[in-house]
Amino acid sequence: MKREQLGSRLGFIMLSAGCAIGCGNVWKFPWMCGQNGGGSFMLIYLLCLVILGIPALVLEFSIGRAAQTSPLFMYRKLEKPGQKWGIFGWFCLLGNIALMAFYTVVCGWVIYYFVQFLRGKNGSLGFSAMISSPSVNVFFLLVTVVIAFFILSFNLQGGLERVTKYMMSALLVLMLALAVHSLFLKGSGEGMTFYLKPDFSKIDGSVIVGAMNQAFFTLSTGMGGMAIFGSYIGKEHSLMGEAIHVITLDTLVAFLAGVIIFPACFTFNLEVNAGPSLLFDTMAAVFNNMSGGRIWGSLFFLFMVFAAMSTVLGVCENILAMIRELTGWSRPKGSVVCGTGVFLLALTTALGFSVFHFQPFAEGTTWLDFWDFIVSNNILPLGSLILALFCCNKFGWGWDNFIKESNTGKGLKVQSWMKPLFRFVLPIIIAFIYIYGMSTFNWR
């Protein structure tokens, strides 16, 4: 099966950034920044991106471009004779499927809110009522899956790349318009002070760990989510520069989300919390109290649809690519089968708040928490640790092969003095994040 290629460098950057940008950029990063020292937290976060995010992203792009296969076979393609790294390709497939088992439902929620604002039904919105409605959850899950796999059923350049370019461009325009509007609200000064004023007294060990976690998880490295796009590009540009472009775009979206949210929340004296309640309850209340709220609310949730759908498209492309390489199916056939499988598995989450109740951990947890635990607490950190060990050591692909691949082409290069960062610092920090996450997890 001939390997498809992206048509442009812009398409590659937009696709990679789109996969990284998601709901977490909106409901987690701004809240963490505001609660944990504002500008001082942002400085620590940016430092963590340099130490963690850029190296992890370069590793994923490199292994994908070198292997020219999906993540299912990339370890097998690059391992030395007699090695058994290939088994970790299945780890990548499991991670992507588990992510779509709940993220497609979240995307459906965003589409539902957008539709309700567009119809002028925003006054009756309620997050608890929505998630406890089996019909709403299942219908908008179906809408999400059908849209995603319909787009993916076309060829790479004519389907995914073209749609993502338009969608990401529209997302950035919408965010800029919403940010400018928020800065003219009467509570903008107070909101921006809460968001960005440096307060180093709030910086402690837990805040630094939080910054490391956010810098690491925002890029979703570790299960081939970025490697697949590396496999679709040529060798005209080195990969350090490409990683910086993607991270810059991802960080810009996260920053602008805070500019949109905090002035609005402080204008209408609404509590700022992390999690879905910030997005669905708080922001819906903001727009319901705002002049022209139906229009601004529709634009906000349209931007959120683009953010969520870009992640769904990126991850589903990864699943589709892996299954197609395993079976030899065409894009249309693979899209139908994979779409059906994702929909059926995601029903656990869609119905988990009502008829299909399951409490995996502490009281109040559901299927969504179970799938999130599989992905965020296990596959992402462990997958990234495996990737770092494989790429930078002789018992894997090896540092020389990695640096040769990452530095091929024009642009910024990985320098030889960075070897200890990639080979020792990165794996140690990832292992720490994993152990810390498991030790502080609320099991019961």
Region spans (language model):
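Hydrophobic alpha-helical segments of multi-pass membrane transport proteins
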Residues: 309-314, 335-353, 369-403
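Inter-helical loop and helix-membrane interface segments of multi-pass membrane transporters/permeases
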Residues: 3-4, 31-36, 66-91, 104-159, ...
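Helix-loop-helix connectors at the membrane interface of multi-pass transporters/channels
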Residues: 3, 107-132, 232-236, 241, ...
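Membrane-embedded translocation segments of transport machinery
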Residues: 2-6, 10, 161, 165-309, ...
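Loop-to-transmembrane helix boundary motifs in multi-pass membrane proteins
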Residues: 5, 11-13, 19, 134-139, ...
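Membrane-interface "cap" regions at the ends of multi-pass membrane proteins
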Residues: 1-28, 56-61, 65-78, 82-87, ...
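A generic transmembrane alpha-helix motif of multi-pass inner-membrane proteins
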Residues: 361, 366-391, 411-444
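Transmembrane helix-boundary motif of multi-pass solute transporters/channels
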Residues: 10-48, 227-230, 240-244, 248-251, ...
